[in-house]
From Swiss-Prot:
The lineage of its organism: Bacteria, Bacillati, Cyanobacteriota, Cyanophyceae, Oscillatoriophycideae. Its cofactor is pyridoxal 5'-phosphate. Keywords: Chlorophyll biosynthesis, Cytoplasm, Isomerase, Porphyrin biosynthesis, Pyridoxal phosphate. One of its GO terms (biological process) is chlorophyll biosynthetic process. PANTHER family: GLUTAMATE-1-SEMIALDEHYDE 2,1-AMINOMUTASE (PTHR43713), GLUTAMATE-1-SEMIALDEHYDE 2,1-AMINOMUTASE 1, CHLOROPLASTIC-RELATED (PTHR43713:SF3). Its EC number is 5.4.3.8. The gene is hemL. Belongs to the class-III pyridoxal-phosphate-dependent aminotransferase family. HemL subfamily. It is found in: Cytoplasm. One of its GO terms (molecular function) is glutamate-1-semialdehyde 2,1-aminomutase activity. This is Glutamate-1-semialdehyde 2,1-aminomutase. It comes from the Bacteria.
């Protein structure tokens, strides 16, 4: 592991300097630029299990997990072997494959709301498509989303969004027409009364409600008791649809996702990350009567050249097979609870104002006394202190998300020893932060 005395990132700095001349900000996604934590971003070279190595040879315990997909650990040998076999048959068919059928059946069996599923190439694409479907099915144009919830970078979702938008402090994005966002109504997360008011003002205009059932893109925020159930009742009352964006929570909180964990079944669900086993993927699914509106069965058009490609399907199949093993989610919950509780106690013992928690294999720590129920609460965090915390942990061989407004992830590859070492490093950092 890295020690602070030997920590150096000369090669990362050289590569990133070159990248800035080639790509906007030197990255392919904004949060990777370390803007909210300061310092130079790390350029990585390889991954294995719970670990990630940079181009300078530094090794880290990884709690980013390629932003969620690596729930079985990086480069799991079973996934790699399955991909090698699939590669021999070709990288893409642009036509139906048996792998699509197998993964579709696994998803339908696992996720309570999904009776039919369509594969796409990213979570953004899944959310774009499902919004069009919600409007097509209901004949209505408006949607309700929640402040700080991120559903990809499509125009209609860049209204009080989370993730990179929150990280960079942008209220929205230039280039998004006001006419587009006028159909997007927003409410604070966990505020059922605000949602009731929006429905009362627009009783016949709202196609549906879209949300992260557990927020991971403005930090880690759990739903208050009764919030998800209240949304389910309201959408039924007004003839609107309820959509869970489970791109992050799907197969991570439980095999059936957040909807299994909380016992609330939406009409539609988006997935991504885990179901591709580390390869680009997305999916949307739900009730059969709604999904049959999707072309070619119905009139709502959506298509994709690489959708359902055999490599992503193969990696997804093998990943879900690994997750089906007995004890998987008990182990994930146990190590994540140990980590989250440990970080919270260490910070509090050192006199820092913090709050946080975990659910399944997902966790978060806010540098504010809290509690955090929504995006406005999350924004009270001490971002300067978080930047120092992130850098100090990085120098000690622990890679956390480079933003206060992103959740953390554990995997089956993380050991008790990894958690113990992480907490030992955190104790050292909190004592001097």
């Amino acid at each position: 592991m890295v020690s602070t005395s030997s920590f150096q990132t000369t090669k990362s700095e050289e590569i990133f300097a070159a990248a800035q001349k080639l790509m906007p900000g030197g990255v392919s996604s904004p949060v990777r630029a370390f803007k909210s934590v300061g310092g130079q971003p790390i350029v990585f070279d390889r991954v294995k299990g719970a670990y990630i190595w940079d181009v300078d040879g530094n090794q880290y315990i990884d709690y980013v997990g390629t932003w969620g997909p690596a729930i079985c650990g990086h480069a799991h040998p079973d996934v790699i072997a399955a991909l090698h076999e699939a590669l021999e048959k070709g990288t893409s068919f642009g036509a139906p494959s048996v792998q699509e059928n197998i993964l579709a059946e696994m998803v339908i069996e696992a996720v309570p709301s999904i009776e039919m599923v369509r594969f796409v190439n990213s979570g953004t694409e899944a959310c774009m498509s499902v919004l069009r479907l919600m409007r097509a099915f209901t004949g209505r144009e408006k949607i309700i989303k929640f402040e700080g919830c991120y559903h990809g970078h499509a125009d209609m979702f860049l209204v009080k969004a989370g993730s990179g938008v929150a990280t960079l402090g942008l209220p929205d994005s230039p280039g998004v027409p006001k006419a587009t966002t006028s159909f997007t109504l927003t409410a604070p997360y966990n505020d059922l009364e605000a949602v009731k008011a929006l429905f009362a003002e627009n009783p016949d205009d709202i196609a549906g409600v879209i949300l992260e059932p557990v927020v991971g893109n403005s930090g880690f925020v759990l739903p208050d008791a009764g919030f998800l159930e209240g949304l389910r009742e309201l959408t039924k009352e007004y003839g609107a649809l309820l959509m869970f964006d489970e791109v992050m929570t799907g197969f991570r909180l439980a095999y059936g996702g957040a909807q299994e964990k909380f016992g609330v079944t939406p009409d539609l669900t988006t997935l991504g990350k885990v179901i591709g086993g580390g390869l680009p993927v997305g999916a949307y699914g739900g009730r059969q009567d709604i999904m049959e509106m999707v072309a070619p069965s119905g009139p709502m058009y959506q298509a994709g050249t690489l959708s359902g490609n055999p490599l992503a399907m193969t990696a997804g199949i093998k990943t879900l097979e690994l997750l089906q093993k007995p004890g998987t989610y008990d182990y994930l919950n146990d190590i994540t609870q140990k980590l989250a509780d440990g970080l919270l106690k260490l910070a509090q013992d050192a006199g820092h104002a913090v709050c946080g928690g975990h659910i399944g294999a997902m966790f978060g720590l806010f540098l504010t006394a809290g509690p955090v129920h929504n995006y406005e609460d999350a924004k009270k965090s001490d971002l300067v202190k978080f930047g120092r915390f992130h850098r100090a942990m990085l120098e000690r061989g622990v890679y956390l998300a480079p933003s206060q407004f992103e959740a953390g992830f554990t995997s089956l590859a993380h050991t008790q020893a990894d958690i113990d070492r992480t907490l030992a490093m955190a104790k050292e950092v909190f004592s001097h932060l």
